[in-house]
């Protein structure tokens, strides 16, 4: 029985060699490994004794030879046995190998590419893969931490095929990890900005280093301006498929306003009424494109949440849309293209540091997606559920009248849920998200949050709000905040906050009375609501009714499904049971 030893990390080497020789195993060693064993007084043959070839190229070629790999890869079958006899090759039953310290080398400051290259192990990786491939016969030890357990079993003749299987898996994992480190290093050296993008830091400033990269080929987006951060890319790469799918499934340009990996707003480009233009702060614009309408709606749905958003647009960005973006506070935008004048407008934001990404509209992500949580890799099939009009065909309520306008809103609300942190509930109306409750552990709390946002959105249409007279010096965020406090009935009666609120106005508006609020909210009708999972109790339906919801979409599966449907029937709602749960994390 032969064992081949070729290690960089010589931890435990001599103890292992001693155990092997005590059982009559003949040792073969390469270079420094053989030297260390020999100097300890044990007998070991150099690899060159079976290859009849010396180490060459300064040690770059030591074990790459048919006499070595034939002995490792040979199976216990007649044809392989015949080949070994004809070539005078002995079988090798045990391989002990670990690799040059590539990771440790590149971690050193100011390491050069030639220095890194010299730590790329070739023969070692080949030994590991060859022995692991033939693990039906060969034992491969790639980790010194396994020597003691192996020795105990080997000396007591208790080494099993299961042990060889485990060692082989570890060897394959070792070579995969090693190659990944090499690829990562050279990706940064030779494909920075193409296959790889170095980020300032991760989710927080202390989480450095950080990067975005593709394992195969170039990144599907180009940075046209600015420097995207980790959170920017999380928002961009979650919001882009949302608008892409809305465009494909509804046929109208779409926009999304993202904050912290959930949409603050999403919409398609339905024309804006004069009232809506006032509500969304675009009444001074005379000409609108569908894309501009889409972003005005997406941004205007929840202006407080959209402050500092990342924008996704389904179509080439035109000048009209760029002008709306240019006067709002946002972090960046992703779109399939930009008109030259529009791009120049966007490049002026943030003193030239505004993040502008151009997405490849033909890019299709891999079917299997992987992420790490606390060092554990989780893998799943990508959520490629198609959300179009056909999804809502199963109507389980007595009222089955689903007009085209409601179907459009259902597609918008449900698609938004697909890219919203769960649990989530979404209200939509007029081609846009009007209230979204995300990331709550309780569905009723999601529902209340979404419903309250929808109520606030509708109250911003109130004549008292539309008639507010702001000072010319009042900035857009100040106006948004003042309106938000007003419609929430949260303006303090006195004090510095009250003074600050009043300072935005030429004329202090009269407060909305409880009666005015209730009467105006009662005029909001035909609202759509979608849920990313079933409604567990009828209390959700009662909350929907408070905000004028007429059309509901949610999956079934609760023991209370019938009670929920019965309650929806009490309010003459149209309830579509969809065959999808849409959790997103």
Curated annotation (Swiss-Prot):
The organism's place on the tree of life at top rank: Eukaryota
Pathway info: Purine metabolism; IMP biosynthesis via de novo pathway; 5-formamido-1-(5-phospho-D-ribosyl)imidazole-4-carboxamide from 5-amino-1-(5-phospho-D-ribosyl)imidazole-4-carboxamide (10-formyl THF route): step 1/1; Purine metabolism; IMP biosynthesis via de novo pathway; IMP from 5-formamido-1-(5-phospho-D-ribosyl)imidazole-4-carboxamide: step 1/1
Active site per the UniProt annotation: 133, 260
Family matches, as Pfam families: AICARFT_IMPCHas (PF01808), MGS (PF02142)
GO process annotations (BP): 'de novo' IMP biosynthetic process; IMP biosynthetic process
SMART domains linked: AICARFT_IMPCHas, MGS
Binding site for (6R)-10-formyltetrahydrofolate: 444, 539, 558-559
UniProt EC number: 2.1.2.3, 3.5.4.10
Keywords, sorted A to Z: Cytoplasm, Hydrolase, Multifunctional enzyme, Purine biosynthesis, Transferase
Binding site for 5-amino-1-(5-phospho-beta-D-ribosyl)imidazole-4-carboxamide: 200-201, 260, 308, 331, 423, 443, 534, 581
GO cellular component terms given for this protein: cytosol
Gene3D superfamilies: 1.10.287.440, 3.40.140.20, Methylglyoxal synthase-like domain
Reactions accelerated catalytically: (6R)-10-formyltetrahydrofolate + 5-amino-1-(5-phospho-beta-D-ribosyl)imidazole-4-carboxamide = 5-formamido-1-(5-phospho-D-ribosyl)imidazole-4-carboxamide + (6S)-5,6,7,8-tetrahydrofolate; IMP + H2O = 5-formamido-1-(5-phospho-D-ribosyl)imidazole-4-carboxamide
Binding site for IMP: 30-33, 60-63, 97-98, 121-122
Compartmental location: Cytoplasm, Cytosol
Residue(s) at site: Transition state stabilizer: 259
Classification via InterPro entries: AICAR_Tfase_dup_dom_sf, AICAR_Tfase_insert_dom_sf, Cytidine_deaminase-like, MGS-like_dom, MGS-like_dom_sf, PurH-like
GO molecular function, one term: IMP cyclohydrolase activity
Residue ranges constituting the MGS-like domain according to the UniProt record: 1-142
Domain notes: The IMP cyclohydrolase activity resides in the N-terminal region.
NCBIfam families, sorted: PRK07106.1, purH
Family of this protein: Belongs to the PurH family.
Function summary: Bifunctional enzyme that catalyzes the last two steps of purine biosynthesis. Acts as a transformylase that incorporates a formyl group to the AMP analog AICAR (5-amino-1-(5-phospho-beta-D-ribosyl)imidazole-4-carboxamide) to produce the intermediate formyl-AICAR (FAICAR). Also catalyzes the cyclization of FAICAR to IMP.
Self-association state and partner proteins as the record states: Homodimer.
Protein name: Bifunctional purine biosynthesis protein ade10
Species annotation: Schizosaccharomyces pombe (strain 972 / ATCC 24843)
Lineage: Eukaryota, Fungi, Dikarya, Ascomycota, Taphrinomycotina
Gene giving rise to this polypeptide: ade10
């Amino acid at each position: 029985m032969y064992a081949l030893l070729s290690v960089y990390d010589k931890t435990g080497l001599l103890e292992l060699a001693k155990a092997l020789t005590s059982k009559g195993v003949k040792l073969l060693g390469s270079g420094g490994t053989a030297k260390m064993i020999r100097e300890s007084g044990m007998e070991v043959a150099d690899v060159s004794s079976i290859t009849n070839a010396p180490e060459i190229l300064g040690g770059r070629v030591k074990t790459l030879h048919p006499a070595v790999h034939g002995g490792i890869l040979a199976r216990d079958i007649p044809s392989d046995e015949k080949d070994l006899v004809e070539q005078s090759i002995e079988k090798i039953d045990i391989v002990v190998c670990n690799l040059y310290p590539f990771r440790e080398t590149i971690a050193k400051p100011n390491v050069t590419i030639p220095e890194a290259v010299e730590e790329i192990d070739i023969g070692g990786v080949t030994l590991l893969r060859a022995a692991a491939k033939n693990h039906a016969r060969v034992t491969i030890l790639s980790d010194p931490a396994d020597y003691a357990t192996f020795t105990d079993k080997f000396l007591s003749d208790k080494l099993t095929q299961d042990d060889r299987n485990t060692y082989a898996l570890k060897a394959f994992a070792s070579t995969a990890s090693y190659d990944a480190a090499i690829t990562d290093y050279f990706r940064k050296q030779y494909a920075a900005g193409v296959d790889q993008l170095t980020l300032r830091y991760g989710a927080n400033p202390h989480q450095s280093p950080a990067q975005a990269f593709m394992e195969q080929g170039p990144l599907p987006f180009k940075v046209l301006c600015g420097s995207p951060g980790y959170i920017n890319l999380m928002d961009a790469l979650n919001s882009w498929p949302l608008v892409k799918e809305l465009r494909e499934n509804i046929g109208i340009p779409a926009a999304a306003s993202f904050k912290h990996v959930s949409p603050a707003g999403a919409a398609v480009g339905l024309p804006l009424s004069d009232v809506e233009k006032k509500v969304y702060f675009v009444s001074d614009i005379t000409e609108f494109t569908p894309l501009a309408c889409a972003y005005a709606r997406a941004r205007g749905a929840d202006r407080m949440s959209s402050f500092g958003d990342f924008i996704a647009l389904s179509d080439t960005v035109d000048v009209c849309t760029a002008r709306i973006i240019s006067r709002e506070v946002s972090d960046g935008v992703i779109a399939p293209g930009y008109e030259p004048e529009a791009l120049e407008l966007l490049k002026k934001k943030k003193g030239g540091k505004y993040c502008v990404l151009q997405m490849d509209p033909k890019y299709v992500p891999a079917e299997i997606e992987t992420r790490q949580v606390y060092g554990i890799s989780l893998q799943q099939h990508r959520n490629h559920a198609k959300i179009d009009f056909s999804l809502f065909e199963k109507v389980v309520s007595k009222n089955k009248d689903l007009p085209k306008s409601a179907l459009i809103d259902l597609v918008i609300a449900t698609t938004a849920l697909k890219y919203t942190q769960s649990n989530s509930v979404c209200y939509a109306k007029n081609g846009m998200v009007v209230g979204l409750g995300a990331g709550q552990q309780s569905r009723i709390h999601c529902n209340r949050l979404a419903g309250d946002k929808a109520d606030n959105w509708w109250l911003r249409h109130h004549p008292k709000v539309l008639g507010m007279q702001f000072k010319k010096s009042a900035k857009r965020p100040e106006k948004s905040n003042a309106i938000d406090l007003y419609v929430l009935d949260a303006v303090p009666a006195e004090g510095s906050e009250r003074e600050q609120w009043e300072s935005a106005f030429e004329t202090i508006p009269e407060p909305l009375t409880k009666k005015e609020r209730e009467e105006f909210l009662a005029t909001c009708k035909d609202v759509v609501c979608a849920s990313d999972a079933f409604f567990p109790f009828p209390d959700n339906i009662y909350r929907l009714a408070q905000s004028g919801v007429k059309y509901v979409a949610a999956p079934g599966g609760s023991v209370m499904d019938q009670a929920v449907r019965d309650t929806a029937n009490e309010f003459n709602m149209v309830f579509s049971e969809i065959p999808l749960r849409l959790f997103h994390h």
